[in-house]
């Protein structure tokens, strides 16, 4: 989305943690060169981690990826507030689907922290310039460690069972793709789905705070809000997890545009196939 390039062009075809960004103009750089104040808060997932990819500044929360050579701003904040080294004491992995409630204070949850930092930047905005702000939440991606407040909302909900299938049981490729999900019991799968939905609801509540901050800063009426994601999650549908295939749950992500400047388009639905890199030109128009 930031480069407007397909994997065929930018070269990262297999998810490479240590592949540097291509030397091309980015979406953030384009906005900045056209007079916009630019800021990113949350997860950028680029290498090296402190590469600002065209933003004037970034405040990072990168899921504790110490092996990539940088300490992010969330880790620094944890250390300053008595939580040094405690982020992963919940013992849940970044790519597993076991779950438990968040183990630290609510303010220390990455979703809350990213929201507060973004609210601060909205309040600190230069009043003489338009702005392009990027707020990126790492959740609901595992680890599945929701706040108990939101997990409790789903304890009594009868959730739909994962979609199953058996017509490819003799396919070696399909069996290999299902191995990652096959280690979980039926009870663990139900817990994982509840936790995933709870983390989505948590973000919904935090977005309310961001919208409220825009409103009280007299910015909401002139702001276009864009809600999107990089990928979905199979969440045990078809006996799979994560994003290893081109089934709908993994590839069909939201692209919702909202705001008073788009009032004439309220309720419009575009059903054409789109991609992450096709968003770049739309945002920059």
Segments the model singles out, each with a brief description of its role:
Residues 1-285:
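Formylglycine-dependent sulfatase
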